[in-house]
Curated annotation (Swiss-Prot):
<comment type="similarity">
    <text>Belongs to the universal ribosomal protein uL18 family.</text>
</comment>
<keyword id="KW-0687">Ribonucleoprotein</keyword>
<keyword id="KW-0689">Ribosomal protein</keyword>
<dbReference type="InterPro" id="IPR005484">
    <property type="entry name" value="Ribosomal_uL18_bac/euk"/>
</dbReference>
<keyword id="KW-0699">rRNA-binding</keyword>
<dbReference type="InterPro" id="IPR004389">
    <property type="entry name" value="Ribosomal_uL18_bac-type"/>
</dbReference>
<dbReference type="Pfam" id="PF00861">
    <property type="entry name" value="Ribosomal_L18p"/>
</dbReference>
<comment type="function">
    <text>This is one of the proteins that bind and probably mediate the attachment of the 5S RNA into the large ribosomal subunit, where it forms part of the central protuberance.</text>
</comment>
<keyword id="KW-0694">RNA-binding</keyword>
<dbReference type="GO" id="GO:0008097">
    <property type="term" value="F:5S rRNA binding"/>
</dbReference>
<dbReference type="GO" id="GO:0006412">
    <property type="term" value="P:translation"/>
</dbReference>
<dbReference type="GO" id="GO:0003735">
    <property type="term" value="F:structural constituent of ribosome"/>
</dbReference>
<protein>
    <recommendedName>
        <fullName>Large ribosomal subunit protein uL18</fullName>
    </recommendedName>
</protein>
<dbReference type="GO" id="GO:0022625">
    <property type="term" value="C:cytosolic large ribosomal subunit"/>
</dbReference>
<comment type="subunit">
    <text>Part of the 50S ribosomal subunit; part of the 5S rRNA/L5/L18/L25 subcomplex. Contacts the 5S and 23S rRNAs.</text>
</comment>
Length: 117
């Protein structure tokens, strides 16, 4: 068996817990890199993306995506797109990332925008 990094172990642990709690709700999946942050709502049953937002979107592209303010903006835009798609309840998938900094800012902004998790 291949040796898993701490990040990969954490990701597996989070995904396993999500499967138990999902109950048919879409998954709000978050990924961050050194420069950008990405978020999408995924319907795992159908295998489709319902809504997505990132710091690479055209209206935000000129700004840096490596700040908590940018992450909060992505969270607000994702919540608006989710409302437009008719989604209010989701399961938050932080992947292997700690719930801190940009991930927390995105989650808080999505909650303020009307998503429940």
């Amino acid at each position: 068996m291949a040796h898993l990094t701490q990040f990969e172990k954490r990701r597996q642990r989070v995904r396993t817990a999500l499967r138990q709690r999902a109950a048919g709700r879409p998954r709000l999946s978050v990924h961050r890199s050194g420069r950008h942050i990405y978020a999408q709502l995924i319907d795992d049953a159908a295998g489709t993306t319902l809504a997505a937002a990132s710091t690479l979107d055209k209206d935000v592209r000129g700004k840096t995506g490596a700040t908590t303010a940018a992450a909060a903006d992505v969270g607000k835009r994702l919540a608006a797109a989710a409302k437009k798609a008719g989604v209010t309840q989701v399961v938050f998938d932080r992947g292997g990332f700690l719930f801190h900094g940009r991930i927390k800012a995105l989650a808080d902004a999505a909650r303020e925008g009307g998503l429940e998790f």
